[in-house]
């Protein structure tokens, strides 16, 4: 278990801007890479203090990007340098992450993926299977949506974080909820982040990014009391419209394999499954 892992001689500290080139080289050329973000985001992540380095006697052995948040933390990136021990790097990362997660009273630490070089070490330290997510794809950005003028759509702002978190918590079960830190990171990283309001109150949000001509929806949440009223479709339409203006021609997203309501909604919009599901592992705190 994490709290019983033996201490190693690796130290963890935040990367500095002067180390950005080393961070990028490691992420691009290592044979053990787990990234759930675009690699070109690394310079910004370093500047924002999110990239943590695993060092041994001052030598770079690996790096990680983990969102430490309440109610859930997530491992969004982990890289091990060629020739270095996966066990030592993963152990050092988890020994750093566990106290940080406990300090914010997190429910869990999540990892999404099936990396054969990484999963056994996470399982050894107490991570357990916790469902799967499925990737869906839509090969077109054309989408018709009825406009309900009671609901307005605008870009999210920094002062919206608390209201966005409230919507997220009303839409998802506890282990899938995003907290304020996650939303702040999304606001900083996502080129597309929209909210839907009624009477000035935020009732839904959508955020995403793009990879060349393919857009990706990172999150869509509608307050539970206002679902099935076309708000999600309206937000998706607005997101697709804005992405299309930037040259995007198709869209992807992920949803829980056992969330049949969510899958039915996305399929009604023209999405279809594209690959086998990815596993979710959690360390429960």
Predicted features, each with a name:
Residues 25-38, 166-178:
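Helix-loop element at the rim of GNAT/NAT acetyltransferase active sites that forms part
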Residues 5-23, 152-164, 274:
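A short beta-loop-alpha structural element at the N-terminal edge
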Residues 1-4, 71, 81-149, 279-285:
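Acyl-donor-binding surface of acyltransferase catalytic domains
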Residues 86-99, 222, 228-241, 245, ...:
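Conserved acetyl-CoA-binding loop-helix of GNAT-fold acetyltransferases
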Residues 134-157, 249, 254-260, 268-285:
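C-terminal "cap" of GNAT-fold acetyltransferases
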Residues 114-131, 229, 233, 257-275:
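Conserved active-site alpha-helix within GNAT-family acetyltransferase domains
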Residues 38-92, 198, 206-218, 223:
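Conserved donor-binding loop and adjoining core beta-sheet/short helix segment
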Residues 109-112, 217, 251-255:
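Conserved hydrophobic beta-strand within the GNAT/NAT acetyltransferase core sheet
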């Amino acid at each position: 278990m994490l709290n019983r892992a033996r201490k190693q001689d690796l130290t963890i500290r935040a990367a500095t801007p002067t180390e950005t080139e080393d961070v990028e080289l490691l992420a691009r050329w290592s044979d053990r890479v787990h990234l759930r973000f675009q690699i070109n985001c690394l310079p910004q992540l370093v500047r924002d203090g999110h990239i943590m380095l695993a060092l041994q006697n001052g030598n770079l052995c690996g790096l990680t990007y983990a969102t430490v948040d309440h109610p859930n933390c997530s491992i969004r990136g982990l890289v091990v340098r060629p020739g270095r021990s996966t066990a030592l790097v993963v152990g050092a990362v988890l020994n750093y992450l566990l106290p940080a997660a406990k300090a914010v009273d997190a429910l869990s630490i999540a990892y999404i993926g099936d990396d054969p070089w990484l999963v056994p070490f996470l399982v050894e330290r107490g991570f357990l299977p916790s469902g799967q997510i499925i990737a869906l794809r839509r090969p077109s950005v054309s989408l018709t949506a009825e406009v309900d003028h009671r609901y307005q759509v605008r870009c999210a702002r920094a002062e919206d974080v608390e209201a966005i978190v409230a919507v997220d918590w009303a839409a998802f079960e506890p282990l899938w909820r995003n907290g304020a830190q996650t939303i702040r990171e999304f606001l900083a990283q996502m080129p597309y982040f929209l909210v839907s309001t009624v009477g000035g109150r935020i009732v839904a949000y959508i955020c995403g990014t793009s990879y060349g001509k393919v857009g990706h929806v990172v999150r869509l949440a509608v307050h539970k009391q206002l679902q099935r009223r076309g708000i999600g479709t309206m937000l998706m339409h607005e997101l697709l419209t804005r992405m299309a203006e930037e040259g995007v021609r198709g869209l992807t997203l992920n949803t829980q394999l056992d969330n049949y309501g969510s899958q039915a909604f996305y399929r009604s919009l023209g999405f279809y499954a594209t690959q086998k599901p990815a596993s979710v592992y959690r360390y429960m705190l």
